[in-house]
Design a protein with these regions (language model features):
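Membrane-water interface segments at transmembrane-helix boundaries in multipass membrane proteins
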Residues: 90-152
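An internal, D/E-rich "acidic patch" concept
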Residues: 13-70
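Short, hydrophobic secondary-structure boundary micro-motifs
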Residues: 19, 34-37, 103-104, 119-121, ...
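Cytoplasmic-entry segments and transmembrane alpha-helices of multi-pass inner-membrane transporters
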Residues: 71-108, 193
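Alpha-helical transmembrane segments of integral membrane proteins
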Residues: 47-84, 129-266
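Hydrophobic alpha-helical transmembrane segments of membrane transport/permease proteins
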Residues: 1-22, 115-135
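Alpha-helical transmembrane segments and their lipid-water interface positions
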Residues: 30, 103-104, 254
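A short secondary-structure junction motif
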Residues: 28-32, 114, 118, 204, ...
């Protein structure tokens, strides 16, 4: 019992609830998240070691989601009701129906087990040159593919609305070329499309948690889930709260952008 009492005393768990809470809050706002129950290391240091990896994965995934969604949505709108449109819509719907973890396992089975061309785990330190870059390919694909379905459909529908607008019909009547007409339609729909992609920031980042665990990717998501399983409460609390702050901040920025881009939202 003496050892237990000493541990409780060292952790400050014998103080009152409000004393513990405000002490933790004061440390949290200064970047001191405490010490891991499992490893004994500083939680801030554990997060710092993995934050860059998660940011690299997020940036790669988000940029590719935006590019592929816009390109496929534009292609689908240009060839409306033709084979390309039907194929893109069917493929997008199929991908949107599959959960992230299932797609991740399929990618591992194909590229790591059957073809043996990409690693399914083993990443320690990432880099865009050298060996580290190959470890990010499969996790990025596993995040991208499920997001394409709804995104491609949104871009397609929004571009079709623009192409059916009165000013586009006027441009057709005046004999403007197809290229210029599509540029006008893209410009008209750009505010809604950019705002829509801005709202995806939080979902893409938070959705990478499971993917990081499946691929043993050394990021914040894997750190958080491992901490939850091991009941390492300081690490779990810090990573979850940081993710929540990021989600709120990302949504706030998206709304501010929408207000600045379109005064009708005021």
């Amino acid at each position: 019992m003496a050892i237990k009492e000493q541990i409780l005393e060292n952790l400050g768990l014998k103080d009152g609830f409000f004393v513990q809470y405000f002490r933790w809050l004061a440390h949290f706002v200064t970047g001191d998240f405490g010490t891991s129950f499992v490893s004994g290391a500083s939680v801030s240091l554990l997060i710092k070691e993995r934050l860059l990896n998660s940011l690299i994965l997020f940036v790669c995934s988000f940029v590719l989601i935006a590019l592929f969604s816009f390109f496929l949505g534009l292609l689908s709108a240009i060839y409306k009701n033709k084979f390309a449109d039907i194929f893109i819509n069917f493929s997008s719907f199929l991908l949107a129906s599959l959960p992230h973890f299932y797609i991740a396992l399929v990618l591992i089975a194909i590229f790591s087990v059957y073809l043996n061309v990409l690693p399914s785990s083993g990443a320690n330190e990432l880099g865009f040159s050298g060996v580290g870059a190959k470890f990010i390919i499969l996790p990025t694909l596993a995040i991208i593919l499920p997001h394409l379905g709804a995104n491609v459909k949104f871009v397609r529908d929004r571009l079709n609305q623009s192409l059916n607008a009165d000013f586009i019909q006027t441009a057709h009547a005046r004999g403007l070329g197809r290229g210029k007409i599509y540029l006008f339609a893209i410009k008209h729909a750009s505010t809604d499309i950019v705002y829509y992609f801005a709202t995806l920031v939080a979902g893409v980042f938070a959705g990478s948690y499971v993917i990081e665990s499946i691929f043993s990717f050394p990021g914040i998501g894997k750190l958080s889930l491992d901490a939850v399983i091991a009941k390492d409460y300081p690490v779990a609390l810090a990573t979850i709260l940081l993710t929540a702050v990021f989600v709120v901040f990302a949504n706030l920025l998206a709304k501010i952008f929408a207000i600045l881009a379109d005064k009708r939202n005021l």
